[in-house]
Amino acid sequence: MKDSQSDIIELCNKLNEATKLKRNGKSIKLTNFVSNTQIKLDSWKFLEWDYGKPSVQLPIQARGLFTLNNDTIAVRGYDKFFNVEEKPFTKETNLKTSTHGPYEVTLKENGCIIFISGLSTGDIVVCSKHSTGDRIDDNESDKTTTATATATAPTRNHAKQGEFELLQQFDGDQQKVKQLAHYLYENNLTVVAELCDDEFEEHVLPYPKDKSGLYVHGLNYNTITFKTLPMDQVLQFAKEWGFKYVSYLTYDNADELFKFLHKCSETGTYNGREIEGFVIRCHRQSHTNGDTDGDCFFFKYKFEQPYLLYRQFREVTKQLLNGTPINSIKIKKNKPITKKYLQFVEKLFEQEPEIARNFENGFDIIKVRQLFLQSLNETNGMNLLSIDSELSDQLKNLALANGNEGLSTTTKYIFVPIATIGCGKTTVFNTLNNLFPQWTHIQNDNISKKAKLKICDLTLLALEDDDQSVVLFDRNNSASRERRQIFTTIDQKRDEHLDDTVDLKYIAINFIPEDLSEEELWDITYNRVIQRGDNHQSIKSQSDENLVESVMKGFIQRYQPINTSRSPDDQFDHVIHLKLSKDENSSKSSLENVRIIIDDLVQNFPDLIKEKPADELINECFQKALDYKPTFVKNMTANTIKKDPTYYGIAMHYSSILENLEIVSHNEHFQNIKSHIQTEFHVTLGHIASSKQDKAGRVKWKKLVKTLGKGDPNKPKSALKFFADVKLLQIVINTDKLACIKVEILKIYDTNDVLQSEIEPINKQLHITIGCIPPATAVESNITLEELYDNPDEQELKPDGTYKCGDDTLHVFNFDNPDLKLFSQQLFVAYQ
C-alpha cells in the first residue's frame, strides 16, 4: 500500500510551508542522519496543542514522521490519539456512535516509543519520536576536556538504544538486520515498538532485565492517511522476528468494551498486574453509502490511579532532594499518604545515600516506591489510596477527640480566570459574588498602581478569615508567566497568612475555547469592548479608542492557552472551560458561563455549593451584575507609564530554540529544568541597570536608546524595526539552577538591510535563558557564563564537559552543527 510520489511531494511542500507559520499549524523540521550512513532524513512535528483542534488543519496527523528527499515517507507513527473524555470526539457517548468494532484492546506498555523502518539501500532506520542516529551528546566514555573539567556521562539517546536492543535481539547478526530492513521497505511498513528497560531509563512501571526489550504494538503503512495492520498480523510479525509483543483482547461492540475498561480501572490492574491503561484500535463509522469500513482510529483509556500518586511521589522526592523541608513541599492530592511517603524517604536517604544519588540520576525511583509499599506490608499501589483515606479519617478523629476541630484540614479556593479583555470575566464574577456573598471578589482593575498590597496580597488577606473559603481572582492572566506569578507569590507568602491545616486549591476558569482562532477572539472581544464604552475602570473605548485597541492587542498577542500538562498550568487542581459566543448579545454568553461554572462546582465540589441556586435567582443576580458601574478609575494614559525603557532584546523564534534543545532533552541535569522552561526566549542587549553601574555603561545605554528608539511605552514589549542574525554556540546547564544558550550576534540591520554597526550590546556574555529553578532567576545566566569564561580574553568555546566553578557545577554541550544560525530575529524594547 503506497501513496503516489506526487501526493508525497505535495505533503512535503505543505510541511515546508508550515515551518513559516507562527502558530495554528506551525511545523518544526529537524534533519537527521541515518545511523552509520550519510543519508539525511527530515523529521516533522507540530505543536502539541494543534493536534485534534478543529480550527487547525494539519497536512498530516502523524506523531512521528520522517521523510526522505521530499518525496518519500520513510517512517510513519500513529495519528495522535487522545484519552477517553479528553476531547469532544473521545467522549464515551460519542465513541459509541462514531466508531465500530472490532475493538482491539492493547495493554499500554510503559516505556519510550521506537520506530523501525527500512530504506532501498538496505539500511535500517531506528528512530525515537523525532530523531535518529548520533547526537552531539553521545560522548565516548573516555572523552576528556580541560584540566578543570571532568568527562560528562553519556546522555540517553533513545534511537541509539533502540538500535542496540534490536541488534541484541538478533544476537549481533547484521545480516538479519538487513533482512528486516529489506522486508519493511518492500512492504512500505514502519514497526512501532515500546522500548522498556529500567537499566536504560525508568518510567512508572517496573521492567526487570528478563522483561526488558522492544515490545511491538503496531505496523503502520508509510502513507499520508493513517493505515495500520490488525493486531493478529502484528503479533505474527513480532513472533517471526523475535520481538516482544503486547497482549491484546478483542470486543465486537462498544458497550462490552467500556464495561471491561471501567472494571479494570477499579483496581488499576489487568490479570493481577499494574498497568497504565489500554490503547483501543478501531475504525471510524463511515456514512458513505452505508459502508462502515472507515479510517483507522485509536483512542486510549488511561487509569488515573495509582499512577497520578506515583508521579506525585516522584515530584515531591525531587523537592526533598533539593532541600525543601517536608512541611513546605506542595502536595496537590492525597496529602496524608504522601507525607507518610516523604517521611519514609527522608529516613531512607539518610541511611542509604547511594539510593538518593541514584534517584537524582533517574534511577531507583521504582525501587524507592516498592520499599515504601513493603514498609506498609502492601504490594498493590491502589491500596495506598485506601490508606490515605484512613489516615485522613484518623486526623479528623484526633482533632475531634482533642476538642479542636481546627486541627482538621480546611479547603479554600482561588478561582483564576484565563482571559483577555472583553471575555466577560468581571460580569461572570460579579454574578457569582451576588449569588454567594460569602465569596470574596477582588478586581485587579480596582487596585492602584501605587498600592503596596497587590492582588495576591489581598487574596491571602481575604483567606485569613475563617468564614472566607473562595476568592474570585479577577485578572486576565492571559500569559502563562502571569499564572506562574500567582502560584509563586502565593506559595512564598502563604505562611504569613495561613497555617498548615489550610489546603489551597486553584480552579482555572478558562474563558477562551481552544478552537477559537486569534482573529475570532479579536472580533468578539473588540466588539464587546466598543459596545460597553467607558463603563470600565481603565479600558474606556469611548474616550480613547486607539489606546484601547493598543492595550487589547497586547493582551491577545501575549495570550497563551492553558496547558495543564506542563508548568505552570499543571498546578491547577481543576479547570472549568467556558464558551465565548459570537452572538451579538454578549450577555447571553456570560449568563450561560455562570450556569456552566455553577453546574461544574455542584458536580465536582459539592461542599462548595451545597444547594444549586434557582434559575430566577441566577437571572436576578446576573442582571444586577450587568447594571454594575465601576467607581474606581485606573489611569491608563501614556503619561502614567514610565518613559524610560527597562531593557532591549532580540526576540528569538520560540519553536526553533525548543527544537535545538534536543541534544539535552534526556540529560539528567536538564530533567529538573524541563518543567521551568520559559514561555518566551530572548537575548538581552542591554538593561537600564547597566547605566547605573559606571560611566561606560551609561554611555552605551544612551547610545542604545538613541539608536533603537523607545517604541510604544503603552506596551510591556514593543517590536522595533531592527533585526539580528544570531548564532547559537552551546548549551550551559548550571546544576539545579538554570539552563542557557551562549550566543553570538553576527549582525544587526534595519528593514532596508542597512547594517547598524553602532549598536553595541552592553551584556558581556550574550545568552538566551532557557529556564530557571526557583529561587534562581534569569540574571544568573549572565553570572554563570562569566564564571565559565572568567578570562575575558578567552575566545575559544569550552568543549563538552563538566566544570566546577566555585560552588556551581556547570555542564557544557556544544551543538552538532557548529554553524547553527537564526536569521531575521526582531529586536524589541521592554517596559517593566
UniProtKB/Swiss-Prot annotation:
GO BP terms: tRNA splicing, via endonucleolytic cleavage and ligation
Protein name: tRNA ligase
Function field: One of the two proteins required for the splicing of precursor tRNA molecules containing introns. The ligation activity requires three enzymatic activities: phosphorylation of the 5' terminus of the 3' half-tRNA in the presence of ATP, opening of the 2'3'-cyclic phosphodiester bond of the 5' half-tRNA leaving a 2'-phosphomonoester and ligation of the two tRNA halves in an ATP-dependent reaction.
Enzyme's top EC category: ligase
Xref: InterPro entries: P-loop_NTPase, T4-Rnl1-like_N, Trl1_fun, tRNA_lig_kin_fungi, tRNA_lig_PDEase
Disulfide bond annotation, renumbered to this chain: none
Family (UniProt): Belongs to the TRL1 family.
Domain notes: Has three domains each corresponding to an enzymatic activity, namely in N- to C-terminal order: ligase, kinase and cyclic phosphodiesterase (CPDase).
Alphabetical UniProt keywords: ATP-binding, Endonuclease, Hydrolase, Kinase, Ligase, Multifunctional enzyme, Nuclease, Nucleotide-binding, Transferase, tRNA processing
Lineage: Eukaryota, Fungi, Dikarya, Ascomycota, Saccharomycotina
GO function terms (MF aspect): ATP binding; endonuclease activity; GTP-dependent polyribonucleotide 5'-hydroxyl-kinase activity; phosphoric diester hydrolase activity; RNA ligase (ATP) activity
Signal peptide stretch: none
GO CC terms in record: nucleus
Reactions performed catalytically: ATP + (ribonucleotide)n-3'-hydroxyl + 5'-phospho-(ribonucleotide)m = (ribonucleotide)n+m + AMP + diphosphate
Positions of the catalytic residues: K108 (n6-amp-lysine intermediate)
One Pfam family, short name: tRNA_lig_kinase
EC number(s) reported in the record: 6.5.1.3
Origin superkingdom: Eukaryota
